[in-house]
Design a protein with these regions (language model features):
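Helix-loop-helix hairpin linking two adjacent transmembrane segments in secondary transporters
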Residues: 137-188
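Helix-to-loop junctions at the C-terminal end of transmembrane segments
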Residues: 58-71, 262-275, 360-361
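Extracytoplasmic
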Residues: 8-42, 60-63, 149, 230-235
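C-terminal transmembrane helical hairpin of 12-TM major facilitator-type secondary transporters
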Residues: 255, 259, 265, 272-324
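Extracytoplasmic gate region of multi-pass secondary transporters
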Residues: 27-31, 210-264
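A late C-terminal transmembrane helix in Major Facilitator Superfamily
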Residues: 328-363
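Conserved MFS/SLC helix-loop-helix module at the cytosolic interface between two early adjacent transmembrane helices
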Residues: 58-96
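Cytoplasmic helix-loop-helix junction between adjacent transmembrane helices
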Residues: 103-139, 330
Length: 396
């Protein structure tokens, strides 16, 4: 654990909600007007965001190593600057290749300013007391779509999609650059200097190349993919069940409410369980929810209730992912190890944006797609049950 700068936690929370709102949620909100203006399909526009997320996943390991050695101030400030440039390029994109290039550049920014680096900072700042602050950060970040979806929609209505991205670039610059530059300036030391040496690299590889690490990584990635692919497509799936559009849209909003509830309850859940028990419980609850959503056509009230449960599982899963490495291997070299750990989750989250609708079309409907996802998550739960009990994680 290292000394925390005054205002650092508040700055991280404000920067996270703004960065998520503008570098991630803005495009799903703007996809219809972008498509209507350019003639690019909705899938193509969404694929640009997915491509950026893949870049973020690839860069995650390198970003984690830099964070361990250099600290967050310069890294996250630079990420914000790159994000501003990316949004400006989105606004000025004259063609599809340039539009994709803009979102690929946004992927560089995402790798430096979204959850993984913020989780690493909080883990270093708070050490054994990290779960509460991590919960707070994800609760605030969880409201990014609530705050920025209507704001982006308003900006698009007033300025058009290109003008709105110019305004968003200004907002990102005015909010996140000062927060990262001025409030992440505390000492970055836990009493023992970080060793960017052969010895430190060997320690990192010993963890990241272990069977236990890779099995946990794969099962967590499966959970990320399946839960996201189903819940993000709640509206078309419920429409296929005969539900009204208004109720289906409300159900998607309630998935978000479920995420908040899950995150609020996670600290107590964590105190009462072991890392393996938490993982298995979250996976089983998620699989059960997906099976019900896949196989039960009615009653609608039950489908909505299960959608909320699925949201709660996603909320818990976010914090489960944030603490998986530190709970098992401690906080030494956390940035590098966690960067390697979450890279597949970031990648499959990007793929799920387009894989869900694609599988639904291939299989003949969203319920059939949900069956596949439920089966995959069930398998992940069975594998997670076999994880050996970890040794107590050393305190930093």
């Amino acid at each position: 654990m290292t000394d925390r700068p005054r205002g650092g936690m508040t700055a991280l929370c404000l920067a996270q909600i703004t960065s998520w709102g503008l570098l991630f949620y803005s495009l799903p909100v703007a996809v219809v007007p972008v498509s209507a203006d350019t003639g690019w399909s909705h899938t193509t526009v969404t694929a640009a965001l997915a491509a950026g997320l893949l870049v973020s996943a690839v860069l995650g390991v390198r970003v984690g190593r830099l964070l361990d050695v250099r600290g967050p101030r310069a890294l996250m400030t630079t990420g914000s600057v790159i994000g501003v440039l990316a949004l400006l390029l989105v606004a000025w994109s004259p063609n599809l290749p340039m539009f994709f290039a803009a979102w690929l550049l946004a992927g560089f920014a995402q790798s430096a300013v979204l959850y993984p680096p913020a989780f690493a900072v909080i883990t270093r700042w708070y050490g054994p007391w990290r779960v509460g602050p991590l919960t707070t950060l994800t609760l605030v970040g969880g409201f990014a779509s609530t705050v920025f979806a209507p704001l982006v929609a308003f900006l698009v209505e007033v300025f058009g999609w290109r003008g709105s991205y110019l305004v968003m670039a200004v907002i990102l610059a005015l909010v996140t650059i000062p927060l990262h530059a001025l409030f992440l300036n505390g000492p970055w030391s836990d009493g023992a200097p970080v060793r960017a040496t052969t010895a430190a690299t060997a320690e990192i590889r010993q963890v990241t190349r272990s069977a236990r690490f890779r099995i946990l990584q794969i099962t967590m990635a499966v959970a990320t993919f399946t839960l996201f692919a189903v819940t993000i497509n709640i509206i078309p799936m419920f429409l296929e069940r005969g539900m009204s559009y208004e109720m289906a849209a409300l159900s998607l909003g309630l998935v978000g409410a479920g995420q908040v509830i899950g995150r609020i309850g996670y600290p107590q859940f964590a105190r009462a369980t072991t890392p393996r028990m938490r993982t298995v419980t979250v996976f089983i609850a998620g699989a059960a929810a997906l099976w019900v959503l896949a196989l039960l056509p009615q009653p609608y009230w039950l489908l909505v209730a299960v959608a909320i449960l699925a949201g709660g599982v996603r909320g818990c899963h976010t914090l489960l992912q944030a603490t998986a490495v530190s709970d098992r291997w401690g906080t030494k070299n956390f940035g590098a190890i966690n960067g390697a750990f979450v890279a597949p989750m970031t990648a499959v989250g990007a793929v799920a944006l387009v894989a869900g609708p694609g599988l639904a079309e291939l299989l003949g409907g969203y319920p059939a797609m949900a069956v596949i996802m439920a089966a995959l998550l069930t398998g992940a739960a069975l594998v997670a049950m076999r994880e050996p009990q970890p040794r107590p994680a050393p305190h930093p």
